[in-house]
Regions:
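Bacterial N-terminal signal peptides that target proteins for export
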Residues: 1-13
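N-terminal cationic leader/targeting segments used for protein routing and processing
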Residues: 3-4, 22, 40
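N-terminal leader/targeting signatures
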Residues: 4-7, 18, 337
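Bacterial N-terminal signal peptides
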Residues: 10-23
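A residue-level marker of the well-folded mature domains of exported/periplasmic proteins
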Residues: 26-345
């Protein structure tokens, strides 16, 4: 059952990550399945009731963003008394593997699926198949180009707004004038596409800022992003006054390229999503700003929404998990610290 979207009150979870072993660190094969169980009985269930089995399929598992999503999912699973099976593709560009994972969980007849689609078009069919098979789906992080009744809810950041905030942060750093480059992520990724479009709309409000390049895809890894950033620096050289990178691996790649050329801190630079290296760079003045999501909240609310859908409760059509901007000036505020360092909150 769905109801008209209402404004969502945001809150930041207080974490104690030492109590949970997330099990998706860089040394573990990303596609290896990880199961997590809540400790309590299912809410509203009688004695001996079957625990709900929820599959959660991210775009990948190695980046800190996904580990934070996983932690939030575990928090919700513990509170609701459900089991979460966490499994993602080895590469964030492997659509076929993600499709196979969805189909596999449908065949296993899990009670529900939370999915972050790698491709807004390619995952439509598998999601509809899940619905026909009686397995409800909640989409999280990145959108799906399907009718709204194809899935129970969409839990995500307002990525277009995030792109606009990135444009404002970069323009403020440049004093409203200069030449900028935007590096795109990967074709088919709806979340980053929205950030890119939001940025281009936002930066267009500054007539003295010129976009030198906004159509180049940096790819899904830090290495490919570093290579693309080097290409942009080779092509435009001293003309570049500012850069926007739309996700964690892209931003880390740009940071490495700037550091390699001793330009970090000299070229205005705004990233999206964080890591320890990015947070350190922000504090050191190598980054002008980082647009932040709340991945812990995203994981938490995705699990909460799918459980509501399974139990026939009202579910919001879109759940906005919030978007924030970290700067060197506010990096030590409680809210920003919890988003930058969820493992230390």
């Amino acid at each position: 059952v769905r109801k008209r979207v209402q404004p969502l009150s945001f809150f930041i979870l207080s974490l104690a990550i030492s109590v949970v072993s997330i099990g998706v660190g860089g040394c573990q094969p990303p596609a290896e399945e990880a199961s997590s169980a809540g400790k309590g009985a299912p809410a509203g269930a009688g004695d001996g009731a079957k625990r709900l089995q929820i599959a959660m399929i991210p775009k990948g598992t190695t980046h800190i963003f996904w580990r934070s999503v996983h932690f939030g999912a575990l928090k919700a699973a513990e509170e609701l008394g459900v089991d979460v099976q966490w499994r993602g593709p080895q590469k964030e560009s492997d659509r076929d593997e993600q499709i196979s994972l969805v189909q596999g969980f449908v065949n296993k007849q899990v009670d529900g699926i939370c999915l972050a689609p790698l491709d807004a078009d390619a995952l439509v069919g598998p999601v509809k198949e899940a619905g026909r098979g009686g397995v409800p789906v909640v989409i999280f992080d990145s959108g799906l180009k399907a009718e709204s009744d194809a899935f129970a809810s969409y839990v995500a950041t307002d990525n277009f707004r995030g792109g606009e905030l990135a444009a404002k942060a970069l323009a403020d750093k440049l004093g409203g004038k200069g030449n900028v480059v935007m590096l795109r992520y990967n074709q088919g990724s709806e979340s980053t596409h929205q950030r890119e479009e939001g940025f281009l709309k936002g930066i267009a409000a500054y007539p003295e800022i010129k976009v030198l390049s906004g159509d180049q895809y940096a790819g899904t890894t830090t290495e490919s992003s570093m290579d693309k950033a080097q290409q942009m620096l080779n092509r435009y050289g001293d003309e570049i006054d500012g850069i926007f990178a739309v996700c964690e691996p892209n931003a880390e790649g740009v940071l490495r390229a700037l550091e390699d050329r001793q330009l970090a801190g000299k070229v205005a630079f705004v990233g999206f999503d964080s890591s320890e290296a990015m947070a350190d760079a922000l504090r050191a003045g190598k980054l002008s700003a980082i647009v932040l999501q709340d991945p812990v909240q995203m994981g938490y609310l995705a699990i909460k929404s799918i459980v509501q859908a399974i139990r026939g409760e009202q579910v919001e059509g879109f759940v906005d998990t919030g978007v924030y901007v970290a700067t060197p000036e506010n990096i030590d505020s409680d809210q920003i610290k919890k988003l930058l360092f969820p493992d230390k909150a």
